[in-house]
Amino acid sequence: MGEAMSWLQAIVLGTVQGLTEFLPISSSGHLRIVSEVFFGDDAGASFTAVTQLGTEAAVLIYFARDIGRIIAGWFRGLFHPEHRGDLDYRMGWYVIIGTIPVGVLGFLFKDQIRTGARNLWLIATMLIVFALVIAAAEYYGRKVRPVEDLRAKDGIIMGSAQALALIPGVSRSGGTISAGLFLGLTREAAARYSFLLAIPAVVASGLFSLPDAFEPAGEGLNASGPQLLVATVIAFAIGYASIAWLLRFVVDHSMYWFVGYRIILGVVVLSLLATGVVSAT
C-alpha cells in the first residue's frame, strides 16, 4: 500500500492537471514528473484519470452549446436523411469514429498504461520525440482547412493519433492537433475538434478508474475522497481558463512555443534520471 497523499500534494497536482490537460505538453506526464520530483512518489494513473473528470467538466461546459447542437443535429440526421450533409450531424459521427481507437487500445492495454508506461525514462523521451512530431506538423501543415471541411478520414486519423496519448509524455491534444495540422486543418479547427474528440474517452477513463482511486491497492500516493474532490474542482476551474486561453493563442501563435518547452522539460528530466536525483519508477 502506498503513502497517503497530503493536502498540499492534492492541491498542487490538481493545479497541474488543470494547467496541462488541454495544452500539447502531456498532463499525465506532468503529473508523473511533478509527483516524483517534488513529492518523491507517483500519484498514480487512477488519480490522473479522476482529476481529468474536472477538466472534462470544463470542456463540457465551455462547449455546451456546440455539444447540444451536435447531439441535436446527429439525431435529426438519423431520422431525416436530408440533414445528413449538415456539419453537426457529420461531427457527431466524427467524434464517435475518432473515439474507437483509443477505446479499444485503452481497454486492451489498461494494465500496461497503469504501470510500465508511467516510467520516467519513457515519459521524458516521449516529451522530446513528440515535440519533433509537433514541430513537423507546424512546419509542413498547410493550415487552410476550417472545421467545416472535416471528413470521416480526418476523424479516423485524428482518433488514431489520440490513442497515442495513452503513453504518458505524448499528449492527447498534441497528438490530435498535430494530426489535424498534417491534414491541413487550421490550428483553431484542429484544437476545437481535439477538445470535442477527447470528451467520450476521458469521461469513460475517469469513471472506469473511480473505484480504484478511492481504494488504491498498489504503490504510490493514495488520495482520500475529499482530496480527490478538491483536486478535481481545482482542475476544473483552471482547465476552463486554459481552454479559453489556448483557443485564442493558436489563432496567432505557432506550436513551436510548446515544442521548445517539451524539449527543455524532457532534457531536464533525463538529466535528473541520469544523475540519480529521481527514480524512474
UniProtKB/Swiss-Prot annotation:
Q: In the record, what terms sit under GO molecular function?
A: undecaprenyl-diphosphatase activity
| Pfam families found in the cross-reference section | BacA
Where is the major localization of this protein?
A: membrane
Instruction: Name the enzyme group at the top EC level.
Output: hydrolase
Give the top-rank taxon of the lineage listed in the UniProt record for this protein: Bacteria
Q: What is its EC number?
A: 3.6.1.27
Bilayer-crossing regions: 89-109, 120-140, 163-183, 194-214, 227-247, 258-278
Gene Ontology biological process terms from the UniProt entry: cell wall organization; peptidoglycan biosynthetic process; regulation of cell shape; response to antibiotic
Q: How does it sit in the membrane?
A: Multi-pass membrane protein
Which cellular compartments is it found in? Cell membrane
What chemistry does it catalyse, as a reaction equation?
Answer: di-trans,octa-cis-undecaprenyl diphosphate + H2O = di-trans,octa-cis-undecaprenyl phosphate + phosphate + H(+)
InterPro entries documented for this protein: UppP
CC annotations in GO: plasma membrane
State any further remark: Bacitracin is thought to be involved in the inhibition of peptidoglycan synthesis by sequestering undecaprenyl diphosphate, thereby reducing the pool of lipid carrier available.
Q: Which family does it belong to?
A: Belongs to the UppP family.
| Function summary | Catalyzes the dephosphorylation of undecaprenyl diphosphate (UPP). Confers resistance to bacitracin.
> Which HAMAP family has this protein been placed in?
Undec_diphosphatase
Give the protein name, as stated in the record: Undecaprenyl-diphosphatase
Q: Which organism is it from?
A: Rhodococcus jostii (strain RHA1)
